[in-house]
Amino acid sequence: MRLILLGPPGAGKGTQAGLLTKKHGIPQLSTGDMLRAAVAQQSEIGKRAKAVMDAGQLVSDEIVNQIVSERIDAPDCANGFILDGYPRTVPQAQALSQMLSGKGLKLDAVIELKVDENALVKRMESRVAETIAKGGQVRSDDNPEAFRKRLVEYREKTAPLSSYYAGTGELRVINGMAPVEEVTAEIERILVPA
């Protein structure tokens, strides 16, 4: 199973990816985790990424695409993977399609978790309150103003992926506002049609 989960910050992509990973035994591939691992391993591409990040710049699509390509080749991805935070742009999606095709692979589905943005802000606020109540650390960008900026960035940069994947016929849209169990069940129905 090769899957992309789309949706704005706070839509529940990480929650769903975690549940699917546990059930199907395939890895969740997070761009941030892959970048950090490449830097820690001091691979050639990791060194290039580190130099860019140390300069306070965004890592180029070329570097991110190469890191993703290398990660997909790892043995634990032989039976599939769930991409989280990649692709973020249409050019990255096009590169992913070419990359997978070159490996003789294709995506099984691109699932978009459709959510109401105002409800997302409330969801974020309650997640912060729960984290604080449990004595946990809160992300510096987990406040309404920063969260709304992340939503705007998502709309501008990542939301066009919906149109792109609708055009390829791979997009499936589900209600991300439903309870977690219902969202999971709907994803399973898409992945394993009756």
Curated annotation (Swiss-Prot):
Q: Where in the cell is it found?
A: Cytoplasm
Q: Enzyme class, one word?
A: transferase
- Can you name a GO cellular component term? cytoplasm
Principal localization reads cytoplasm
GO BP of this protein:
AMP salvage
Q: How does it assemble?
A: Monomer.
What protein does this entry describe?
A: Adenylate kinase
- Which species? Brucella canis (strain ATCC 23365 / NCTC 10854 / RM-666)
